[in-house]
Structures are given as C-alpha cells and as structure tokens.
Amino acid sequence: MYKELKRFEQILFDACSLLLLVFYTWSAVITPAATQYHRGIYIIVTYILVFLLYRSKSSWFRMIDYLLIIASLTSLGYWLLNFEVINYRVGAETELDTVMAIIGVLISIELARRVVGNVFVVIGIIMLAYGVYGYMMPDAIAHAGSSFPELCVSIFYKSDGIFGIMANVLATYILLFVLFGAFLEKSGAQKFFIDLSMASVGHKVGGPGKVAVIASGLFGSISGSAIANVVSTGTFTIPMMKKAGFKPHQAGGIEPAASIGGMFMPPIMGAGGFLMAELTGQSYSWIMAVSLFPALMYFFSVFMMVHYEARKLNIVGERSAHSGWTVLKAGWYYITPLVLITLLMLYGYSPAYSAVIGLVGCIVISWLRPGTRIGPKRFLEAAREGAENSLKIGATVGVIGIIIGVLTYSGLVLTLADIVISLAEGSLFLTIVLIALVSLIMGMGVPVTAAYLITAVVAVPALTHLGVNELAAHMIVYWLSQDSNITPPVCIAAFAGANIAKADMWKTAFSAFKFAKFLYLGPLLFGYVPEFSLDGSTFDIIKVFIYIAIGTWLYSYILSGIWLQTWFGKREGKKA
C-alpha cells in the first residue's frame, strides 16, 4: 500500500512515522508529555496516516482524502490547542466547540470504515442513534436521550470518549511495542525463533506442527496480532507441515490455533494486557505474572493436541542440520531485547520506557550480523512498518470512543450487566457462556482488542457481582475476545491460515477450533479456580498448578481422539 503512494505522500508518511517514534520515545524516556499532547499527537498523526494509506480509488476522490486530512487537523488540532479552555467551560460549550466535535465524530466513523470495515461502523452508528433516541427504546434499556450535537460534544470532549482510555493506552503502550516488534523483526529475530524451534523439535513426532506452536509463541507474544502472526510465521510453517504429512486443513488450522496464544503470552500480550492494567489499576508486571501460567497451559494444550494428531498420522519431521543448543549459542542475543523488557518491567520501570530500551537493544544486536544491520535506511523502514502496523488498531479509537461514550452517557453499562445476570439466573457458568457468545458476535466486525474493551465494560461488573475477582473477570473477557479468530463462522485468523495452506476454509476453521479448545477451558478456570489467577496461598497455587497441568494433558489426550484409535484402529501416515 505504501508503494502505491505518490512520492510527496511517501515523504509525508515517513515524516509522520518518524514523528511518532521520536515524540513517544522522548515522552517515555526524557520528559512525559502533557495529557492533551500525549493523546492528541497520536490521534492526529494516526488519522493523517490512515487517510494517506487507505486512500480512495479514483484520483478525483483522492481530493476528498486531502480534505479529510485537513478536517482532521482542524478538528483534532482544535481540541489539542484549546484543551484547558474547553475543560474550564464544561457544560457551556460554544458553537465552534460543537461544530468541531461533530466534525471529529463524523471523521472518526469514516476513518474506521476504511480500515476496519462496515460492521464496526454500523455498531458505532447504532450507538449514536441510541444516544439520541434512547427515550424511544424499550423500558429495560431506555434513557432520556440527547440531541445529536450535545452527544457529539460529550463523546469528543469528555475523558471516556474519543480521547479516552483507548487513546491513552494506544499512545502510552501499544504504539511503542508495535514499533519494538517492527525493529525486532528487522534485526532478524523472527528467523532465529523459527530456526531454534526447528532445531529443537522439528525432528520429533509431529515436529513441523510443534515448530509452528513454539515459533508462534515466541514471535506471537511481540507481534500484537494473531492474524499478523499467522501471515508471518505461517508462510514458513504451514508448507512445512503439509510436506511432513499433515492434511492442508490441519496445517492451516494449527498455525492460527498457536498464533492466538501469543495474545496471552508475556511480555507483551498484544494490546489487551496494557488495557487490562489501565482498567484494573494493577501494575503491568502483575498482569504478566498472572498471565504466564495460563498462557503456558494454552500452548501445552495445543502442543499435545498436535503431538497426538501426528501420532495418529505417524508423522515424524526431518532432523535439522544443527541442534537446538547450537542454534541458541549462535543467536542467543536475539532474546536479549525480550529479556530486557521483561526485567525492566519487573523492576518497576514503565512499559513505555522498557519498550524504548528494548527497541534500542534491537538496533544494537542487528549490527552483530552484516545482513541484518539497521542503518538509516532500515531504521526508516522499521519506523514506517511499525507505524503502518499500528493503524489497524489505531483506526478503531474514534468509534470505540463513541461506543464507550454512549454506554457511559446513557447508563447502559449497568443496565446490560443486570440483564446478563438476570438471563444467567445467577449462574457463573451461564454468564461465561453468554459472554462468549457476545464476544463472538462482537468479533464478527470488531478487532479483538476493541471487542475486549467493549465487552469488558459490560461483562466485568456481572462477573464480579457473582464473586469473581476483578482481574480474573478481565482475563475471562480477554481470553474469550480472541474466539472470533478461530471460532466459526468468523474465524479470521483461521481463514488466513486456509489461504496459505490452499485448504478448504471451513475445514480449516473447524480444525483451528479443535486445536484451540483450551481457549474455552481457560475462562472457566479463571472463573471457578481463584488460584489460576494467583489468588490464594503459595501452597494452594502450586498444588492447583500441578492439578491443572495434569488435567490439561488429559484434556488434550481425550479431545485428540487418539485413545479411540488405540482401541479400534491403526495409525496411518508417513515419515517426512
């Protein structure tokens, strides 16, 4: 997409990418920016980049893109430059304040339409209509309603709207970690992760499938997107699995099942972990600690499912030319940026500061090999790719602000929580099932991070009302928000895997659904077993971890169906 831009547009895109990198690095390491600049610069630059990159098809309509860029600069810049004045006159906004708010809200809808799609936008428009015509709704969800201009003012200027929690998390954490991921990839780390996985388990039973699980765990924890992980690691692992003897739909299903585990795996956990820290008030290091064992159990489950599937098909991979230890000795330094980030956060440094130090570490290690050195040209490429990768989630900020703003403005948050509790009749199990259905439906048109935030606003109060601790409640919602990646009929990541595997989309989707079954067990454990989220005595936590590890193995063994084959059939397949 970048290559299709005109030369002056490319220069503008590069300049904006460097501005994001420099400004937020300075803010994280040297001097924190004031709230309005911290959030405002991010949103303004993101809007400019989106209208540059996701452009209109005809040259005539391209002029509209430029007008939208100017309108974005005007409206968002007005908020930025008049932040303190507007805060002083809350409730007494001027006509100009109102006009700028309306422009900002409408532009946010168009921005999301270009990047995310129509379904997400329709949800935002429905929420706007609900905010205006709430008095016409059924009694259970009715509210007084508001005029459209008044609602836009609330959404645009209040702290729970467009410039609210999502904007803060994206500007404070996500952007720098997405940039870190781009620099880590430029340094050659992705190849090292795959080589290490290949050398360690590639020659074992189901070796290529296990390589996909381990490589996706290593790279997925920093890629920030299950789909990006499938597309990047899957281009290597899926053909390798097919060659070894896995059926195309199995190879295409294993990769997305493994890839979504990266969203749970510390140190980065996609965007959700940072949102969780912001919403719960817990330190991110504690979020990482709570997430580690459940994430390991998820990968253990997928790993064992792959193992038993390979045993059924008698698939054994080829031995690598080098041992895992040899590969690790040759490229151990690729792990240092991740170790640096983890240690810094555990020692109390902010995630943003840690990400910057990790990014510098990526540049340093890149110079250890001539082919991966990050000089000025590759530095600009990494900054550009990082900025571009951030747009998928960044483009949601406006419509999420609309949805959260209307939910808060109307009081619908508490109403929906009461409805969920009422429908579940006080049953925790049914409440979790309802949340799973809501997150799946939400995921049909909303990115998973947005689905998590929107669902959490409604579902967490319902779960805590039933006795689940707040962090465990957020974990339940966050895990279930990933289900749209692999659960039919949506399963976006599974469809990406099917495309690479050249397999039937629905067979691949159900294969991914099968391999990722722990995704549905995890939320139940968070709900019913407090120790799973480190809530209990040390002895009880250790005891429960042992039980869960054994149970996860048994769970995978039973779901794989290999015990049926052991009793009634013989293995068939081939050796790679």
Feature-to-residue mapping (PLM):
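Long, contiguous bundles of hydrophobic transmembrane helices that form the permeation core
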Residues: 2-11, 17, 289-389, 492-576
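Membrane-interfacial loop-to-helix junctions in multi-pass transporters
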Residues: 95-99, 160-173, 199-213, 244-250, ...
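Hydrophobic transmembrane alpha-helices that form the pore/transport pathway of multi-pass ion
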Residues: 194-262, 268, 281, 448-480, ...
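Polar/charged low-complexity regulatory segments
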Residues: 1-116
